[in-house]
Amino acid sequence: MITIDESRNNLFDALGLQRLKDSYMKEDESSPQERFAFIARQFCADDEPLAQRLYDYMSQHWLSPSSPQLSFGRTKQGLPIACFLPYLHDTARGLIDTWAEVSELSMIGGGIGLGVGIRQPDEKSVGIIPHLRTYDASCTAYKQGQTRRGSYAAYLDISHPEILSFLNTRRVGGDHNYKLLNLHNGVNVPDSFMKKIWILSTLAPFVKMDPCPTTETLFKKAVTTLKDSRYFGADDRWLGEVSFAALAEQLDVVNRWDLIDPHTGKVKETIKATELWERIILTRAETGEPYIHWIDTSNRALPQFQKNLGLSIRQSNLCSEVVLPTDETRTAVCCLASLNLDYFDKWCNNEQFYLDVATYLDNVLQYFIDHAPPTLKRAVHSARSERAIGIGALGFHSYLQSKMVDIESLPAYLINKKIFKTISSHLERVNLELGELRGEAPDCVGTGRRFSHMTAIAPNATSSIIMGNTSPSCEPFRANIYKQDTISGSFVTYNKHLKRLLEERIPDNQARERVWSSIKMHDGSVQHLNQLTVQEKKVFKTWPEINQLSLVMLAADRQKWIDQSQSTSLFFNPDERISYVHKIHLKAWLHGLKTLYYFRSRKILTVDKVHHTTTTADPKTENDCTFCEG
């Protein structure tokens, strides 16, 4: 029997409490504490002390379950898995089996990250667009409970002959027969393409320069920087022979990018790499997508024991934080939960906490293996073989603000490293401990590991609201005050750390309300306030006000301790120069990020955050993925 503490309801704000009631609690549950206790009992594997500890972690907001776990039990067919990664194999059986699998997954509440491995149109194939149109339509065909419709993303290699058509599927205008407005899209980008972009962006400016000792010295330094990079190897010896005099002709050769039919291996067309890259950047600016998956970076990080089995990563998932091997026999499974960094100081050295969280997700995974229908045999095979889980985080920006640390400062970088190094080291120990107690995953035989992967940082915007209105994932707050509409009414939400500061600084209630009104009028920004110091204004910068390179470098630093990926979104002003946007994207690849999620803009942000409308009765109003919440 779990001992429930109703006083922990005070940890919710009004919006978080209402969101939990509207979207996750069962009709016969009168308190959020009952919901947490139910989840703890379901996934404790009959270990009552574990159930009590899991309840305590959730009710104290240390641990956030993913959405399918949080809503578990509301429907008979639901399974506690957030997202699935099927691979669309280029055979008749592969096409049929994947369609059946995806339909089943949509009905049980899973988001889809589809790897597209089929050929361009020929005498036997209609190409990718007609197939993807069926998936686009099915997004609206399956309603998952009361809160959302199905949601899919498709990933295509950047060398596929239909890549340009694929990039146009979500853009405004054009033939409606080639539009996929319900289907998110992502692009697999290899190092070979990014090296071309890096070379061209580094050396192209010299083409227009007059030869002189200064420019030739700068040119040689630029070439040396490229040659010395870890991305360049034996195949790039030609860089040593690049000449200033013949640079234009040499760069024309570099700029050639072959589009290759994956079925025949034949080059179907050659286009300019720079034009394709610019199309990707502009499409992201216009639509927020495609997501970018640097597939070679992901595969380099794949554990050697899985490489030895001939496995490889072919795509990411709906929210770009999961990178696991897939093929015609494996549909990767996302089994997620998040640690609330707002409480990092309380649980960071609690060894039992890490063991319990990993055990909890292992139990969730086993429940899926035991209860999944036969249609999901590929997903069950993947889950059983690698037992991958994704322990993530939320509340990073909130934690920094609680310490009055500016997210762009050196202390923030040091805290970032400390947090994720601490989590990783504890989980490595737990992986071996559970491997000894419960046995190695089949993929991991000989390593002592229970899990092939243990960490992935999901976007978890909804979870952050429920978990005490903390900041989502590792993203900054988008505004310090915003209004959110739900089916139960409107809520004005305040940054809790700023609220505490203003209550201390401005005792008069009416004066304080005038300050909040002023913040609201400035799109949630505090940069205009005379009542705050320069340092305090830095601490409470909103996402649009933060240098995106700082966010990329923070993500790159923590990636060293994350064995999967992160849902890393970037914000740019609508009038931002494309050269700056290119620079940030290039830096993300150079510094080892595996994926980029959404491209945000102020136009979207103003609507999305200062007046954030999410009427949960209408799935069309939910722009962000909720499957990986956790």
Curated annotation (Swiss-Prot):
Superkingdom of this entry's organism?
Answer: Viruses
Catalyzes what? Answer: a 2'-deoxyribonucleoside 5'-diphosphate + [thioredoxin]-disulfide + H2O = a ribonucleoside 5'-diphosphate + [thioredoxin]-dithiol
> In what way is its activity controlled?
Under complex allosteric control mediated by deoxynucleoside triphosphates and ATP binding. The type of nucleotide bound at the specificity site determines substrate preference. It seems probable that ATP makes the enzyme reduce CDP and UDP, dGTP favors ADP reduction and dTTP favors GDP reduction.
Active site residues of this protein: N317 (proton acceptor), C319 (cysteine radical intermediate), E321 (proton acceptor)
Do you know which PANTHER family this protein is assigned to?
A: RIBONUCLEOSIDE-DIPHOSPHATE REDUCTASE LARGE CHAIN, RIBONUCLEOSIDE-DIPHOSPHATE REDUCTASE LARGE SUBUNIT
Functional description taken from the UniProt entry = Ribonucleoside-diphosphate reductase holoenzyme provides the precursors necessary for viral DNA synthesis. Allows virus growth in non-dividing cells. Catalyzes the biosynthesis of deoxyribonucleotides from the corresponding ribonucleotides.
- Protein name listed in UniProt: Ribonucleoside-diphosphate reductase large subunit
Q: Which organism is it from?
A: Invertebrate iridescent virus 3 (IIV-3)
